[in-house]
From Swiss-Prot:
Transmembrane segments: none annotated. SUPFAM superfamilies: EF-G C-terminal domain-like, P-loop containing nucleoside triphosphate hydrolases, Translation proteins. One of its GO terms (biological process) is positive regulation of translation. This is Elongation factor 4. Residues 4-186 form the tr-type G domain. SMART domains: EFG_C. GO terms for molecular function: GTP binding; GTPase activity; ribosome binding; translation elongation factor activity. Pfam families: EFG_C, GTP_EFTU, GTP_EFTU_D2, LepA_C. Its EC number is 3.6.5.n1. Keywords: Cell membrane, GTP-binding, Hydrolase, Membrane, Nucleotide-binding, Protein biosynthesis.
Length: 600
């Protein structure tokens, strides 16, 4: 194979800037997919991806392109997720490429996530082609967007293709730019020791785990003995090939190619994205750079509403885990919610997507507790424990300090919302770092703040303040000590473990008051009075009372029969005291959802 005719590239963009639509047009123009098989967002395989208009799972496809210089080229398009939760996957798929197409919406301009992904591409030394999309919109301002890209990112836009991916206008210019500007895989050597980067994996019920790979050097054939360098696990290649986007089997793959390989691997946990495949007989000395083990950043408890569906829920998690190695879970029991699982996710979007897939694809009705981050708890006996479940936090006297994860957040916003967004960040314990100018009307705010404050309703407030115009991205910068306490909720004197949360001391009173008030509204009245208390240790910081129903036991008495009336009321009072001692309070599902929505 002539390596000079190969082009490996990704498309990067902010959500809704037209990445998947451009991919569709490229598939059409190169006749990769027949017109009758074409559908919108073809590379987005899940219904959730199409409905939300986002890419979650990576996809790759090989295309053939006949260029203007009468040459035939092979393009490998590696589709990438655009959301901050999946940054590591984006970085690995970019590492499989030599170039990237940066798609920017002509009416929106440069957004926070655009910057995040561009910097990843720059870190991978990729050739970046800026493409300005949606030029057919009435609100498009091409010159302004060109200026933004040149000023903020430093890319020359004088020859940028100006396109409409929706109508197909000028998309041919993008294909020609790929040929002219993106380099071929020049370092690809066939006779060197095998090195292949795993940039994605999924489970197939016939083949087992299928790994999406980019061969950096060496060759790979069916029957070869291979080794995964992070675990030293050895396997035999059973089949390999390329995607067009259909699965096409081949006998071998060469250096510089992008394809897939299966080796009878049973579970996806055995394969790590970013790992290097090498040969058992002639192994490489060093793995490829950039591999790291992914750790969940956000945890929550998920429980089936119907307790009889526990086994179905467990099987559904096992099936989803086959195609998503970043999901972690372990069994958990709650006094309030019964049997369920403590699940770990890469971020809030990842959590929502997994929950939605469980409910949709497996017909389950689920309830989730408030999300929590991983805290580092330093005990007085010098031990350090990592904790993601607030209910398991030790007593205050055993703790010397608690550290929580901090992130650096970049918010791209129109200038008019800056004051309100700065207030929001300060209310979320943000530390101001910098403000960068995009143009006359847009700025980038840079803050450092606790991750726990971002997962707690930050996104909704940001969108509400900016009327949807602001966008943000964040990255973990490490752990810092904070004044944190565990707040519990007691109903009728009994602690409800599913309501426990770790909060900053500064917010404990407001959140306690807001939550007790919300629960008072949502929990139905009982036949006895129910106190709703927010507590820190033994101290009650907020209390509301759900009044009892008052049954009129005296309705059939004569007005003059005062002693009988008094006797009946005393009896009712005794009954209520007894009922309160043995009575349990039914908590409706809405109450568990309310904990996610309480306002500061």
């Amino acid at each position: 194979m002539d390596k000079s005719k190969i082009r490996n590239f990704s498309i990067i963009a902010h959500i809704d800037h037209g990445k998947s639509t451009l991919a569709d047009r490229i598939l059409e123009l190169t006749n990769t997919v027949e017109k009758r098989e074409m559908q919108d967002q073809l590379l987005d395989s899940m219904d959730i991806e199409r409905e939300r208009g986002i890419t979650i799972k990576l996809n790759s496809v090989q295309l053939k392109y006949h260029s203007k210089d009468n040459q035939d080229y092979i393009f490998n398009l590696i589709d990438t997720p655009g959301h901050v939760d999946f940054t590591y996957e984006v970085s690995r798929s970019l590492a499989a490429c030599e170039g990237a197409i940066l798609v920017v919406d002509a009416s929106q301009g440069v957004e926070a996530q655009t910057l995040a992904n561009v910097y990843l591409a720059i870190d991978s030394n990729l050739e970046i082609i800026p493409v300005i999309n949606k030029i057919d919109l009435p609100s498009a301002d091409v010159d302004k967007v060109k200026h933004e890209i040149e000023e903020i990112i430093g890319l020359d836009c004088s020859k940028s293709p100006l396109i409409s991916a929706k109508t197909g206008l000028n998309v041919e210019d993008v294909l020609q730019a790929i040929v002219e500007k993106i380099p071929s895989p020049s370092d690809a050597i066939d006779n060197a020791p095998l090195k292949a980067l795993i940039f994605d994996s999924y489970y197939d019920k016939y083949l087992g785990v299928v790994m999406s790979i980019r061969l950096k050097q060496g060759m790979l054939k069916v029957g070869d003995k291979i080794k995964l360098m992070s675990t030293n696990a050895e396997y035999e290649v059973t089949s390999l090939g390329i995607k067009t986007p259909k699965i096409v089997k081949k006998d071998f793959l060469e250096a510089g190619e992008v394809g897939w390989v299966a080796a009878s691997i049973k579970t996806i946990k055995d394969v790590n994205v970013g790992d290097t495949i090498t040969s058992v007989l002639n192994p490489a000395d060093e793995p490829l750079d950039g591999y790291k083990k992914l750790k969940p950043m956000v945890y929550c408890g998920i429980y089936p509403i119907d307790t009889n569906k526990y086994q179905d829920f467990k099987e559904a998690l096992e099936k989803i885990e086959l195609s998503d190695s970043s999901l972690v879970y372990e069994p958990e029991t709650s006094q309030a919610l019964g049997f369920g699982f403590r699940c770990g996710f890469l971020g809030l979007l990842h959590m929502e997507v997994i929950q939605e897939r469980l409910e949709r694809e497996y017909n389950l009705e689920l309830i989730a507790t408030a999300p929590s981050v991983v805290y580092k708890v330093h005990l007085t006996n010098k031990q350090v424990i990592e904790l993601d479940n607030p209910a398991l936090l030790p007593e205050a006297q055993k703790i010397s300090k608690i550290e929580e994860p901090f992130v650096e957040i970049k918010i791209a916003t129109p200038s008019e919302y800056i004051g309100d967004l700065m207030n929001l960040c300060q209310n979320k314990l943000g530390i101001y770092k910098n403000m960068e100018v995009i143009d006359n009307n847009r700025r980038i705010l840079i803050y450092q703040m606790p991750l726990a404050e971002i997962i707690f309703d930050f996104f909704n407030k940001l969108k509400s303040i900016s009327k949807g115009y602001a966008s943000f991205e964040y990255e973990l910068i490490g752990y810092k000590e904070s004044k944190l306490v565990r707040m519990d909720i007691k109903l009728n004197g009994e602690m409800v473990d599913a309501f426990s949360m770790i909060v900053n001391q500064k917010f404990a009173y407001q959140r306690g008051s807001a939550l007790t008030l919300k629960l008072k509204e949502l929990i139905p009245r009982q036949n006895f009075e129910v106190p709703v208390q927010a507590t820190i240790g033994n101290k009650v910081i907020s209390r509301e009372t759900i009044k009892a129903y008052r049954k009129d036991v005296t309705w059939k008495l004569h007005a003059a029969d005062k002693s009988r009336r008094k006797k009946l009321l005393e009896k009712q009072k005794e009954g209520k005291i007894k009922m309160k001692e043995i009575g349990t309070v039914e908590v409706p599902q809405e109450a568990f959802v309310a904990i996610l929505k309480i306002d500061d």
